[in-house]
Amino acid sequence: MKNPAPYRYDIVGSFLRTKAIHEARSKFEAGEISAEELTKVEDAEITGLVKKEENVGLHAVTDGEYRRSFWHMDFLWGLTGTQKVKSEHFSVAFKGFQPKAETVKIVDKLDFPDDHPFLKHFAFLQSVASDLVQPKQCIPSPSMLHLICCVRSTDYQPIERYKDEQVLLDDLAAAYQKAVKAFYAAGCRYLQLDDTSWGEFCSAEKRKAYAERGIDVDEVGRKYVYVLNKILEAKPEDMVITMHICRGNFRSTWSSTGGYEPVAEILFGHCNVDGFFLEYDSDRAGGFEPLRYIGKQKVVLGLVTSKDAKLEKKEDVIARIREASKYVPLEQLALSPQCGFASTEEGNLVTDADQWSKLTLVREIAEEVWAD
């Protein structure tokens, strides 16, 4: 049977951390509880979250990223050949609050270790999800490691092995191929790659800043599609791999603005993922015209914001779905919130009740628009 993901109404992945999670993480960092005690709290809270996800009617469920500090760093720090580093500031500036100044650098040959902690995290999610839903695993796109270490960083010096950048790209692809196979072996059939690089490359301001440093972001984008397509060669037929594209989501703030046109042909026209989750909740994302480059991929429209509590009007969202269907057939479209509710452990400036109201709205709209 064909894997139906992404679903007509779906989620990006992260949820607001509960009070118990916040308290346990604080105690763990202060040395007041052990790693085992922290895991016990996380397990209990994730079990409760999955029940709530099922109760709201979701077909795909996640662990809310409850075990992570960041949507991306925890995974990247777990790769062989990377190192967690403290820095003076986060790797990208947000319009408002700034995240913790922790980043990553490449210090050795890249690889995906057999004991990467996320494999155990997925196994637990699968163990508490019912047979009626599909557990979904979200990890950062490979582009993020290259973007943070080699593009955003103004003082990047490649290690000896990576003086030829092609070797780096091929090692990165091989590491992620191993990740895909390992998650598949663990039972994962729905994997999402989260990626803010394309959001940056949509920004005229950021494109100009990179150009002034001698960086051709279109060329970088082509390299990322090369890596992504190499990874997708390892994807078994009954596994779905999607990509979520974001313009930043930290405590309800953002980091990039600009429509998809600058990256549309390179990304939508050539990247072989099964679907794109696309942020479309504000005018910062531009119009739907760039979707004309979409081929067979499904497009999950992020028309409902996760950044504030105000509920969108159903008729407005439905009108926008109809508008998007001028460029992509309605049967290839789906609906989700624009991003997660807590891309970092701090979370967006919304309440627990708000996030469930948003998901209920997404489900109700999808049921009105699509018969299936």
Residue ranges of model-derived segments:
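Domain-level signal for soluble alpha/beta catalytic cores
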Residues: 1-372
